[in-house]
Amino acid sequence: MDIKIKDFEGPLDLLLHLVSKYQMDIYDVPITEVIEQYLAYVATLQAMRLEVAGEYMVMASQLMLIKSRKLLPKVVDDADLEEDLEHDLLSQIVEYRKFKLLGEKMAEQHEERALYYSKPKIELVYEDAELVHDRSAIDLFLAFSGLLAKKREEFRHSHTTIVKDEYKIEDMMDVVLERCKSQKKLALQELFTETKDMNEVITLFLATLELVKVQEIQLFQEENFGSIYLIRK
């Protein structure tokens, strides 16, 4: 089964999504938390052997530099450089948001003008105006990155010898649906409590993503950064 994760338009689009979850001025967001979420997203993609575009890796390197400088003891010159790097990053996100909103407005105006003409509408070629992403799936992906790290640590300290099985996404989809059927809402972390190895964890997650994609289950989150629940439709 070929599962494709919808990409953002680029690293700035992903960062904009992450900072927007804080619902505050971009310059006031806890930048270290945002950086950790971004790096966790990229690391999870790599752990699942999914392709990561080069531009995301370049941004990851820049973010790791900012994060490392924030963790080091403060030196006057370095502190100034750290503030400059952080301010430059946030300014890029602010500018990108302006550009994105402008693109969306242009797309809306194009749609409105098309209503007044009888001839077929010409599609507006403006990639940044699209920006249609499956945010629910991305939020699920970000939540999974934390679970993945915990399960990896759990298996590392486990002394149980386990024979690795071959897991199929189709079979795991049935498992997820059955679990959701037996409970009104299923917390994401509960889905992975009985997993035996990383192959099972990853296959189970891919099955969950596919069920979201085909709209057999929906995701529910009471608040930003809160627990994610699965509900069968």
UniProtKB/Swiss-Prot annotation:
Its main location: cytoplasm. It is found in: Cytoplasm. One of its GO terms (biological process) is DNA replication. Keywords: Cell cycle, Cell division, Chromosome partition, Cytoplasm. NCBIfam families: PRK00104.1-2. Participates in chromosomal partition during cell division. May act via the formation of a condensin-like complex containing Smc and ScpB that pull DNA away from mid-cell into both cell halves. This is Segregation and condensation protein A. It comes from Streptococcus gordonii (strain Challis / ATCC 35105 / BCRC 15272 / CH1 / DL1 / V288). The lineage of its organism: Bacteria, Bacillati, Bacillota, Bacilli, Lactobacillales.
